[in-house]
Amino acid sequence: MFFRAYAKINISLDVVGKREDDYHLLEMIMQRIELYDILEVTKNKTGINIKCNKSYVPLDERNLVYKAAKLFLDTYNLKGGVDFNIIKNIPVSAGLAGGSSDAATTLLAMRELYNIDVSDDELCKLGLKIGADVPYCIKGGTALCEGIGEKVTNLKGFKGHILVLVKPKFGVSTKEVYKSLDINKIYRHPNTEGLIKAVENNDLRYVSENMRNVLENVTLKKHTIIKEIKEKMIRSGALGSMMSGSGPSVFGFFDDMLKAQRCYEYFKSKYNDVYITRTI
């Protein structure tokens, strides 16, 4: 059986507090995009086996697919195992939830493969044990995510909007970005309520002009190239441009495919991981 594991972008990312265990409390609007990994999943009699088309992806218990499969088998006391063949298209350490989406898709695939009667909400609780973005990746679409990311409220779809996505030639550690964030020095928060209304009204211009990610300045201090990519996107005709998640991926929304294509071609001459895609 084949399953798609979709990437996400952030339309907004705000940090509104911090728990005693040092996890940050978030308020984010997440959006699924048409960039995906493919998971080929097959039952076997014993063990979890992983293959992948990218050599840098670990094939053992460090892989979130492995963790998700093991968690599912253990939780429901299932005998047997599963083989995975991962076709990796989403860049790693990019702020696009590639690993979390693979884990979420693994849980959904295991439910189908083993015919277990378990709701999406129950899968989300399992997924949270793997990572804070996994519950959103199970539900997908357009959503407001709160808490550490586990409270997912689906919004009316913000579908079909063109974006150009660029991942620079380095990765970023989410943990390190949050560690470097001083929540007392966040002077400009996103207007999450206004963005929710704009998303639900399908108002691309308002969304593009008012997107905000409070982690951007943290990552920018170490990687000024992010600012340069954003500025070039705007000059290329993007309605707005922002870093996704903890970075370093940057995206820009376009209302003109020709402008988007030209922007794509410019960045493709400089970077490997460049995409024209859409919100879904």
Swiss-Prot record:
Listed GO MF terms: 4-(cytidine 5'-diphospho)-2-C-methyl-D-erythritol kinase activity; ATP binding
Positions with a binding annotation for ATP: 91-101
Swiss-Prot/TrEMBL keywords: ATP-binding, Isoprene biosynthesis, Kinase, Nucleotide-binding, Transferase
Superkingdom assignment: Bacteria
Alphabetical GO biological process terms: isopentenyl diphosphate biosynthetic process, methylerythritol 4-phosphate pathway; terpenoid biosynthetic process
Task of the protein: Catalyzes the phosphorylation of the position 2 hydroxy group of 4-diphosphocytidyl-2C-methyl-D-erythritol.
Protein name: 4-diphosphocytidyl-2-C-methyl-D-erythritol kinase
Species: Clostridium novyi (strain NT)
High-level lineage: Bacteria, Bacillati, Bacillota, Clostridia, Eubacteriales
Gene: ispE
